[in-house]
């Protein structure tokens, strides 16, 4: 199908800018220049109407019947207009085919390229086992629920674990830490008491042995 093309029409500067005045031009010359510009505008409009009439008479439904890919200023891929994208009345006669993942963006490409590395780093059976493993409690039940991977990171001696869940408030945490410190102090007191008793018993035994030895040496 042949395309109807309009001849290039050159519009002088005075038409695009009516207030333009060349150097040394009188008022009469300016009015003559504007009259000539009006003639050029009329000729251009007549040529455009002739092109539109020719396109209608030859049955051209879409003057953009060639494939054109528009790209944005930042280099992103644009859209494609193909044959019969628009009907004779200017409305869309059909939807273009969906763009490929490369056109949409790099998200799908990046995810697909990293999938083997993710599978190699974290095996699927490990993920399923971690998800199916029940939650465990550490300490004596006062600590919040911990998963299998979190139990080894919990420091029961320092007692400075903050729960990541929303079921433990600040007051609950303070009470839990206070109970742990009280138990630690109580165990320390018991240990010191036992150590003192043992030390007294050992000293008594040593003194008895020394007394018996001295009694035998010095009758």
From Swiss-Prot:
Chief location bin: virion
Residue list for modification Phosphoserine: 163, 165
Q: What PTMs does it carry? A: Phosphorylated on serines within the acidic cluster. Phosphorylation determines whether endocytosed viral US9 traffics to the trans-Golgi network or recycles to the cell membrane.
Gene Ontology BP terms: intracellular transport of virus
Question: For side Virion surface, which residue ranges?
Answer: 215-219
Residues on Intravirion side: 1-193
User: Where are the annotated segments for Acidic?
Assistant: 153-168
Q: Where is this motif: Di-leucine internalization motif?
A: 145-146
Please provide, in alphabetical order, the Gene Ontology terms of the cellular component aspect for this entry.
Answer: host cell; host cell Golgi membrane; host cell plasma membrane; host cell smooth endoplasmic reticulum membrane; membrane; viral envelope; virion membrane
Q: What is this protein called in UniProt?
A: Envelope protein US9 homolog
Q: Which organism is it from?
A: Equine herpesvirus 1 (strain Ab4p) (EHV-1)
